[in-house]
Amino acid sequence: MRKFDTKVQLLKYKVLREVARIAFDEGEFSLANNFNDIAKTVTSDKATMRCCIYKERAIVAERIKLACGGNRANPNIIEVIDIACDECPASGYQVSHDCRGCIAHRCESACRKGAISFDENQKAHIDKTKCVNCGQCAKVCPYSAISNYTRPCEKACKIKAISMADSEENPAQIDNNKCINCGACSYACPFGAIMDKSFILDAIRILKDSNKGDGFNVYAVVAPSIASQFVYAKLGQVVTAIKKLGFYSVVEAALGADIVAYSESKELAEKGFLTSSCCPAFVDYVKKFYPKLTENISHNLSPMAAIAKYIKETDETAKVIFIGPCTAKKAEAKQERVAQYVDCVLTFEELQALIDSSKYTPLIHQGLNIVIAGAPNAGKSS
């Protein structure tokens, strides 16, 4: 049984599935004429998530654009859907109604910036122009009446790559110079206003051009976590479904890890101190925030790229599509040293949408249910 943590994930899945279905059945060039039809397909006749059905469909249209590859001029994988952003109110420490107006005024004593004042009822107030969000007032309040209200996206981004643009009335913006494409903000946003670009159309184009292996062979390199991703089906069923899509073979990325481990052990013995090159988000993090350690990053390819290189050395006309859980892998595949080996990257949710969209591929198992974890209808057919 396929479960989604939130309705945001379910909506994203529906958009990806419909985009893939049209690309499979009618060709990707027909997508431009089907934007409105897709928007109507994945939403109800009445507004269920936004102020009106028209805004819902406008937001879905933006999701469709990202499902089709997004803004190609923007090198970042993670993008903000401006119209979907709720422009959350200012973050920071705020005094709640739990303030009892005590006479101890510990919050005032703890604040070195003079940001705490009191009204005629002795209720505390914080001057946001003076507050530096140090949190000292919250620590000493005996009633825990001071809380730190943080925007979900900003809270999720530990490297502070996302913020509100200019003022509170503008949508969130991502600093590409800081962003490592980890996707934490995308998962955290309750409005689904942050999304990763999809290359599902690139994958479909490769599969179609291969003509079921008559033109060239398409290899699916899968991350080890595939074993726990499709918990409602046996791994063999998932592999069969992947091959039904037109893949020639399914290869474990773990084989690439063995190749990297062998080479990396020699580099480690030589350098003495070495950091991993396996995770592109981590590598990007080191380069952007700890540039002095760049030379200590392993010079080996990641397991994904290593096994893809091996495949292309043994099958010169091969195309390789990596399938895993990580959005940062999409950014890695665009790197010059990796792009020659990896032709496309899909996430597991995109693979699910691809499987469910293809008329050539039966559902992984009979009676597949799509539900949201914790929802009232969880466990029931939908």
At which residue positions do the language-model features occur?
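Transmembrane alpha-helical segments of multi-pass membrane transport proteins and ion-pumping complexes
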Residues: G101, H105-A110, V140, A188, ...
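Conserved Radical SAM active-site core
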Residues: D127-K128, N133, Y143, P152-A220, ...
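Iron-sulfur-associated redox domains of electron-transfer enzymes in respiratory
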Residues: M1-G69, M195-I355, P362
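Ferredoxin-type iron-sulfur electron-transfer modules and their immediate structural context
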Residues: M1-V140, S144-A156, K160, Q352
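Gly-rich Lys/Arg/Thr-decorated short loops/hinges at beta-loop-alpha junctions or inter-strand turns
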Residues: D86-Q94, S117-H125, M164-D166, A184-S186, ...
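Short coil/turn connectors at secondary-structure junctions
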Residues: A90, R106, R112-K113, N121, ...
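ATP-binding Walker
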Residues: C102, I180, A378
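Conserved G1/Walker A P-loop phosphate-binding module
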Residues: D356-S382
